[in-house]
């Protein structure tokens, strides 16, 4: 069972938004307060977003579909791959190729090409061709693998898509919306939550925050066959908990990762 506490969110720096001047007005309903020119997100609404997303993911998995993990920014790339692999789900963590969803059949042809090249490497085919040809094929394989490895086994369109940083992954969002694929995303204070089906208000830059959210989605997948899902524990109110956290230290970490 996944157990989420308000304190775990605070310790991961989930509550830190961007500088006040970078606010997307559509995020106002998710703002708790302002500290030192930094917006603080309402963690009660973060918890609700987690709960809604957890339930959506479990419905998708029970329907026999997959959740596509997407996060190509530096802070998210490794985490996205790790958690997607842990839950045996497809992922995109290098670059979103236009048409990955909206032109799925063409993308699948590229995937088949990648699989063919990988097969040639191990079935003895490379032993029968020149070193120059091997070099050319290896370059082609590496180029394809860089962007397609995570979706090699995604034979059909996903039942949902989980995104870190919707501003960066706008093309993925546009394609998912066009195909009516539900979108789950961490939405920071500079994001538009209105294009997301299940927005989770949170810090999408701090590594600990990204890791926490991605793990929650992965846990939801792994626990989809259990009757008891997520448990949210709030043993202290948000204001009291914030006093226990060294805001100055968390803030400096968060700002450094954002480059602000």
From Swiss-Prot:
Belongs to the universal ribosomal protein uS2 family. This is Small ribosomal subunit protein uS2. It holds the Pfam family Ribosomal_S2. One of its GO terms (biological process) is translation. HAMAP family: Ribosomal_uS2_B. NCBIfam families: rpsB_bact. InterPro entries: Ribosomal_uS2 (IPR001865), Ribosomal_uS2_bac/mit/plastid (IPR005706), Ribosomal_uS2_CS (IPR018130), Ribosomal_uS2_flav_dom_sf (IPR023591). The keyword Ribosomal protein applies. GO terms for cellular component: cytosolic small ribosomal subunit. GO terms for molecular function: structural constituent of ribosome. PROSITE patterns: RIBOSOMAL_S2_1, RIBOSOMAL_S2_2. Keywords: Ribonucleoprotein, Ribosomal protein.
